[in-house]
Amino acid sequence: MXXXXGYLEFDGARQQSFLYPLFFREYIYVLAYDHGLNRLNRNRSIFLENADYDKKYSSLIVKRLILRMYEQNRLIIPTKDLNQNNFLGHTSLFYYQMISVLFAVIVEIPFSLRLGSSFEGKQFKKSYNLQSIHSIFPFLEDKLSHFNYVLDVLIPYPIHLEILVQTLRYRVKDASSLHFFRFCLYEYCNWKNFYIKKKAILNPRFLLFLYNSHICEYESIFFFLRKRSSHLRSTSYEVLFERILFYVKIQHFLKVFVNNFPAILGLLKDPFIHYVRYHGRCILATKDTPLLMNKWKYYFVNLWQCYFSVWFQSQKVNINQLSKDNLEFLGYLSSLRLNPLVVRSQMLENSFLLDNVRIKLDTKIPISSIIRSLAKDKFCTVLGHPISKATWTDSSDSDILNRFVRICRNISHYYSGSSKKKNLYRIKYILRLCCVKTLARKHKSTVRAFLKRLGSGLLEEFLTGEDQILSLIFPRSYYAYKKLYRVRIWYLDILYLNDLVNHE
């Protein structure tokens, strides 16, 4: 962080958020290369090598493009001529791709510095991978069992491009950068619409920047109001809807209730709220009454409609009662399960039986949606009956077997945190039988004859992996009694959703 801050010491421009001069600074490209700002892009950096065009280029080309843009406006080309205009051996699509990535890299610098400064002085567990999707579930296991309601919110996206420009104005102060951003944004949409039929690969870094800036502005307002409502221990939700002199009103409001209704004061305390954002959605978990949850719901609707000028319907905010409803969360169906327990209490010569209830987070596999995904990819029918994969019969036996084993292991790895493994075993069974039918079809034989000829050793690859590893971790007596069926294990190396989750 100190080295990144040293790069940006130029005439106080960093303090004023003047980013446009950075387009002409050579060390910015060195910073992008040395400090790994291109990690958000799963491909290689566009400043080093572009796999689509197989060309290498440097910051000098970027400077020439910007100068030419101001001199003759030749970058503003009609959509139908996008592939016909060449400059330095590249098409105009290459210009937009390169400049949009450059803009994203430069604007990421103050965001990265601000994010890094917020983490200074805070300690995180080294073994806790915050990038992993599965890192959310241990947190929810500890917290959701104490709550009863969850708001499931679909985060809307701005329809008009000027909303994104206005959002960036709060972060970037110089007009040159804003004008340049507006130009990149509109031209980017022009060639995106032209190439959408050809399924061209869009610039993921620029899209991630737009998404993160939009989300950052929304969450900054939400967390500000959430923090304000937590300053006073005994407050009501009036602070979120009527902010004028709310401290005086709340104090007077509490004074009345303390004098007249002391027994009800505990019901007015601001509950503890947990907020989690994932995959274009966010959830708000709290222990509230239905009335207060409805207030939170319409608060989100008014926030998006009034502040961001985005049409946001109340149907996009679902109120789930965890004890009755299932919450679709990252490919799992989560709910609260009540486990009744009987505790025997002994007091001198008298003994009592106490009924107790233990609340646990139940994570289940949505078997119906996964079967639809498998049926869509021709692994089984819509009823879950395995069929042969006809398109793979041209491959070798080892390739076919390796493909099925890889898919089966990925699914087992992702859904290792399910409370009950019955549905997971069913998915494995479908893939195993589909593999056998595919191999039997290739060799023009029946499944029974094929297995009889090769033996059961063919499917041993499916069995090696998670089950055998877990049998080594836990004691043999633990594994012998099949308690492993209820063990949930969350892997902290999963960074992306499983393909079968995105069945929609």
Swiss-Prot record:
GO terms for cellular component: chloroplast
Give a GO biological-process term.
Answer: mRNA processing
One protein family per Pfam: MatK_N
Alphabetized, the UniProt keywords read: Chloroplast, mRNA processing, Plastid, RNA-binding, tRNA processing
Q: Where in the cell is it found?
A: Plastid, Chloroplast
The signal peptide here is: none
Question: Record keywords: Repeat included?
Answer: no
Return one GO MF term: RNA binding
Residue stretches spanning the membrane? none
Q: Which family does it belong to?
A: Belongs to the intron maturase 2 family. MatK subfamily.
Q: What task does this protein carry out?
A: Usually encoded in the trnK tRNA gene intron. Probably assists in splicing its own and other chloroplast group II introns.
Q: What is this protein called?
A: Maturase K
Q: Top-down, what is the taxonomic lineage of the species of origin? A: Eukaryota, Viridiplantae, Streptophyta, Embryophyta, Tracheophyta
Q: Which gene encodes it?
A: matK
